[in-house]
Amino acid sequence: MAENRYELNKNLAQMLKGGVIMDVQNPEQARIAEAAGAAAVMALERIPADIRAVGGVSRMSDPKMIKEIQGAVSIPVMAKVRIGHFVEAQILEAIEIDYIDESEVLSPADNRFHVDKKEFQVPFVCGAKDLGEALRRIAEGASMIRTKGEPGTGDIVQAVRHMRMMSQEIRRIQNLREDELYVAAKDLQVPVELVQYVHKHGKLPVVNFAAGGIATPADAALMMQLGAEGVFVGSGIFKSGDPIKRASAIVKAVTNYRNPQILAQISEDLGEAMVGINENEIQILMAERGK
């Protein structure tokens, strides 16, 4: 990928900053998400909660279903590919998807290698649970990073852990001397230029969203206050009692994340949140995929 194309892709991802990206399974849900103010939608045949419940191998969604969602909304549409499955990515690029998420939510196709994202024109989103993972994905050509969390649980604890971990490691890099950055880059297994960027700017070179377990407006505001630049909401909306109201409330929470009065108002009368699964009740399946 030409350097100027990558810069363009990073800028495209920056345009989603401060927004909410919602998992949708059909055109009707996509229209609900768009009406609620979503910045983009993620087209998925099965949302993470269902993938977790059913088990088995989960793959890229049917291109026909993705195209139906593309035709239903005017906001950007994303879709997921398996880690390392560059042919699934080629297919999504062929149907002119707006963003590709190389996702640990699906069953990995390759246990060692990720997709070479520089081979594609479409911007890629990747998950990371610490600074090393984030910078390695960026070195491969990712235009956007999100926390991995533990999708499909409705439990925010993993996303919080990953965001705090990333922030702590960024602060550690900032406190290093210039001549210590080379060793840090070697330890993180990334080009020194990326570590130098973090040292100078105190943040990732690409936009950084939160994902995994976000189920309430308060969850979304929590992740924003911890440093996220936007949020992904998967199972939390359409597994809840009142998806339309909850979707709108989460969008408002991301915009007003530092205003407790507004957060209190929009948290009222949302119907039942998704039941969720406590992290202590499950085996951590997805967050450990793709390091």
Curated annotation (Swiss-Prot):
Tell me which residues bind D-ribose 5-phosphate.
D23, G152, G213, G234, S235
Biological process (GO) annotations held by this record are: amino acid metabolic process; pyridoxal phosphate biosynthetic process; pyridoxine biosynthetic process
Q: Which Gene3D superfamilies match?
A: Aldolase class I (3.20.20.70)
| Pathway annotation | Cofactor biosynthesis; pyridoxal 5'-phosphate biosynthesis
Q: Which reaction does it catalyse?
A: aldehydo-D-ribose 5-phosphate + D-glyceraldehyde 3-phosphate + L-glutamine = pyridoxal 5'-phosphate + L-glutamate + phosphate + 3 H2O + H(+)
Q: Which UniProt keywords apply?
A: Lyase, Pyridoxal phosphate, Schiff base
InterPro entries, sorted:
Aldolase_TIM, PdxS/SNZ, PdxS/SNZ_N, RibuloseP-bd_barrel
Active site residues per record = K80
Q: List the disulfide bonds.
A: none
What Pfam families does the record tag this protein with?
A: SOR_SNZ
SUPFAM superfamilies linked = Ribulose-phoshate binding barrel
Q: GO MF annotations for this entry?
A: amine-lyase activity; pyridoxal 5'-phosphate synthase (glutamine hydrolysing) activity
Top-level class of the enzyme under EC nomenclature: lyase
Q: What this chain does, per the record?
A: Catalyzes the formation of pyridoxal 5'-phosphate from ribose 5-phosphate (RBP), glyceraldehyde 3-phosphate (G3P) and ammonia. The ammonia is provided by the PdxT subunit. Can also use ribulose 5-phosphate and dihydroxyacetone phosphate as substrates, resulting from enzyme-catalyzed isomerization of RBP and G3P, respectively.
- Subunit record text: In the presence of PdxT, forms a dodecamer of heterodimers.
Q: What is the name of this protein?
A: Pyridoxal 5'-phosphate synthase subunit PdxS
Please give the organism. Haemophilus influenzae (strain ATCC 51907 / DSM 11121 / KW20 / Rd)
Per the record, the gene is pdxS
